[in-house]
Amino acid sequence: MHTLDGIICYLSKEDMELDPKAFDRVMYSFYRFKEEGIRLHLTILAYRLYSERKHADEVFADRSPHKIGFMFLNEFECERFRFGAEKLLNTVNPYTKMRLADDPMLLSVELYNEMEVGADFVFSFYHWNKNPRFAPLQEKIGEAWKSFLKRRNLPLRPVPKRIESGGRNSPDETLFLEFCSEQLDRSYRWGEKVLRDLGWKGAIVQNSQSKRIVYGSSRWRCSNTVEAHGYFAHPSRFTGKGSQNYQRSSVEGLAEQFRSINSVRQYGRAFQTGEFNHAFWNRWIHEGGIVYPALAAFQGHQAIAYFASPYNMRHSGISCFEIAENPVMAANGFLGAVLFGRGDIRPAKHQGVLNIPNSYLKQGTNAYFPINSEQSKIALMT
């Protein structure tokens, strides 16, 4: 459950000031989840960072720089994180009579939704950001890069301007990937401490969207639980005018959506899918209730969650993601609950494991790319 940072303060008069009515509705929703036996995956920061409505759209528009800000432990983003974690985890729920941090209903906590999307743009943000509000963050990145090089007894050099495939990559670009991965470690450890100090003892996840191996190395060092997000036939511009998506079957592509998500799974670690769906505009949408849930059950994943709302009070047309407005997606949700949740498909007895040596990550910009599509097919084996 995320975007709470765009709900509980939105109608208040100040940023980081609770709207009592909205916060009560959130507390009641937690209670109802518990009554229905639903486990909760909670995201602390997502898009609006507990801003009131006059500032919320501006914060949303700057979502990538704000992710970078949290990555480099910028005070603006860290303060918003501390606020959200304190209110959501440490408040005694008037309906359940306990803190969420102590409630077995809470399955896992994500620090910042799809954090590494910001990490993808660190080098371009550093060189081309023109917003004066983020100038101090640019300076912070430059100082962190210098410190990183000094710790390795390396000569100072500029932040790279690009990272790409092919023979034009320099050793500096490979080094910069290590730098970004290290910064993700630092932000994870900082957020982890905040949550542990509040008494949360369960799973903490981060870097849930990108399939780049470099982010997997950070997950491996930091967390015993891995989460991933992904969509089949994700529209090119979401639901905006001119958006396009492809019209092939997910079965035809040998379940590439599942294989892509499963490729970030790590041996011996709990694995969950915090967001997945089969987009509305793809004519094979009815496959969304069978292909992904069945394979996730077959491979023994711990949890899966459709994106997004199973119920919506808005009177709007069918969208690409909202289950509430789409009867086919609603049916897919039921089938997913049967195949995965009820256990109609049992996990395979064997798994294929792909070993990625550290030497591979040091070669060129290998770390910048995901697992090869052919290699990801081990997810279909048993």
List the model feature ranges, each with a label.
Residues 121-125, 235, 286:
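Single-residue recognition of alpha-helix boundary sites
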Residues 33, 38, 184-203, 211-233, ...:
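Catalytic-core region of carbohydrate-active enzymes that cleave or remodel glycosidic bonds
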Residues 1-193, 197-223:
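Active-site mouth of glycoside hydrolases
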